A protein has these predicted regions:
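Electropositive, glycine- and tryptophan-enriched low-complexity nucleic-acid-binding patches
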Residues: 1-29
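Short, surface-exposed basic-aromatic patches at helix termini and helix-loop junctions that form
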Residues: 43-51
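Short amphipathic alpha-helical "interface-anchor" segments enriched in bulky aromatics
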Residues: 148-182
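A short, flexible helix-boundary coil/loop motif
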Residues: 171-233
Length: 233
């Protein structure tokens, strides 16, 4: 967890993400964002921070979403990468393709911000525990990037994004009890403390995070100091 920013009750995640981009302090970072952040001001903030942005586009930007789909059917493919994961009755194939925007965005308000269109096609077969039959699901997602990027880079970035969504956010919500918290006075302070504890436990991981949290709670001050690296030679 590199940064944590409180969101004002009268605001939302969009301006907060723009502020966060400006304060990362990481040279030329690659940042992935949900469709909520597919905003021109966010791309402007990314350009100021010298960041490469990969942002999902959905129907909250209907014109751009349709243009992205049109580009993927009419313009040249620049690169493509595929991967397959099998295990525990699950078989997933991902095909990531990067396209040149061509002339479709010419003259549009998005033209200065979009250097590449990314299509992610995902097909999953899951074996039913009841029937033994494979159930197939498929989905296609579209992303826009403010810099040219290879399909392999886009594949790693988009997959890593959902890995964070599934692991970090779930852990904070369930293992660290964020969803169950009823703290109303300075909740941001406690959110930062959870992030601090999460980072320490993850850096000293032995078993599952829930098990390590339990061990740390039983270990007293000595165990906590050891996790923090205090007093070690």
């Amino acid at each position: 967890m590199l940064a944590h920013l409180d969101i004002d009750e009268k605001s939302n995640e969009i301006p907060a993400a723009q502020v966060l981009l400006a304060s990362l302090g990481i040279p030329a970072p690659l940042v992935t964002l949900d469709a909520l952040h597919c905003q021109k001001k966010t791309f402007e903030a990314g350009a100021t921070a010298d960041a490469t942005l990969i942002v999902q586009v959905k129907d909250n930007q209907p014109t751009l979403h349709q243009q992205a789909q049109d580009i993927c059917t009419t313009e040249a493919q620049l690169s493509q990468a595929s991967s397959r994961d099998k295990g525990r009755g699950r078989d997933e194939t991902r095909v990531v393709t990067v396209f040149d925007p061509g002339e479709i965005l010419n003259g549009s308000e998005w033209q200065p911000h979009v250097a590449a269109i990314i299509r992610v096609e995902r097909t999953v077969y899951i074996r039913s525990t009841k029937t033994g039959l494979l159930n197939r699901t498929s989905e296609t997602a579209f992303y826009v990037a403010n810099a040219m990027i290879t399909a392999a880079e886009a594949a790693n970035a988009t997959r890593g994004h959902w890995g964070i969504e599934n692991s970090s956010h779930y852990t904070r919500d369930v293992t660290m009890g964020e969803d169950a918290s009823r703290i109303r006075s300075n909740p941001g302070v406690f959110a930062r403390l959870r992030s601090f504890a999460y980072n320490i436990l993850k850096a000293n991981r032995i078993g599952t995070l829930a098990q390590d949290r339990y061990r740390a709670a039983l270990g007293g001050l000595g165990r906590l100091l050891k996790l923090l690296g205090v007093g070690q030679r």
